[in-house]
Amino acid sequence: MDYWLPIIVLFGAFFFMLALGVPIVYAIGLSTLASISTQLDFNSALSVVSQKLASGLDSFTLLAIPFFILSGNIMNHGGIARRLINFARILGGRLPGSLAHCNILANMLFGAISGSAVASAAAMGGVMHPQQVKEGYDPAFSTAVNVASAPTGLLIPPSNTLIVYSLVSGGTSIAALFLAGYVPGILLGLALMVIAGIIAVRRGYPKPERPTLRQAGVAIWMAIPSIFLIILIMGGVLSGIFTPTEASAIAVISTLFLALVLYREISVKDLPKIFLESVITTAIVLLLIGSSMGMSWAMSNADVPFLILDLLNTISDNPIIILLIINIILLIIGTFMDMTPAVLIFTPIFLPVVTELGMDPIHFGIVMVLNMCIGICTPPVGSVLFVGCSVSKLPINKIIKPMLPFYAVMVLVLAMVTYIPQISMALPRALGY
């Protein structure tokens, strides 16, 4: 019983406080303190928690997060979303359900630049939903398309979630994680487009008129600076010209230039509000990271990963079954916990387990983030689901049924990425990671 006491206290206190509605940062910190106090005296436990809080934030890599958050907020206010939508409409062409395809492609592009699924759902839903309804699309279907596709950009770099995973996994290469996310992210987007197209054909949704050559040229020309930004950031990181942290600073400078000078969608007077939004978001994320470092130490000190591995081995010694169980657990976790805290808390638990099975940490990072992408679209706590419904002004219960085909295809892609490592590992290995 003494051996299990720190673990029981840690998770018992954590989930009890979550059930009471205690903010997750406090739930993590207090449950960690209580768990460590079962092994050390209170003052020593308090010292460990405070040291881990400070050391967890003492990382040059972490500087990328506030810069990418600021860059995303500038994009959200700077008219970039509208230009990406116009570009996506050209790519969608006259396919059945073209506006749904446009929504998915625009979310992939905007999410890849901003790194925020919530921002993508809000920005794209605000523009695309009224257009789709006007063209005769079912409002619930339109919302489901927006919600399901918003997280695709979290796999397509740059991604704050992959940066967080790199930190908590012990320094997995960020460039390798960025490379590994491309194919799964694009595969997920294409799979969603297939489902949207099938539904559009069955329901007889109209095809848009073919754009004139001039309209296509203008849309592509106006989107080139935003597309070039993705190429600049990723090309610089992968070529070694600059680090991910330096890339994030370049992203801020570039988006400021686009929004203030080129597109002129915001003025200098709008910047304090954007900076304040970014500071608040950054503070929340960094508090979560710092407090989670103490929890990770408490779990490692109590040998939680090895206990989990022993438990899974008693169920089955088949890696396929063990990975299936881990995916099911992560999917359940994703339904009630936001992405960043879930990655911070459960990576230290499951990463040692999967590495024992021979799974590459880069591969597992993509699997974990893909699980969380599904989770944030799922009730009861899915943040993207709530934002998507608030934008379209529809209750969540109206969206669940239209979401079911998209959930199915997302789980199918998850299974493919889990059991076919080449999907995520081909690019990193080809470039020497």
Region annotations inferred by a language model:
Residues 1-433:
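Alpha-helical transmembrane segments of multi-pass membrane transport proteins
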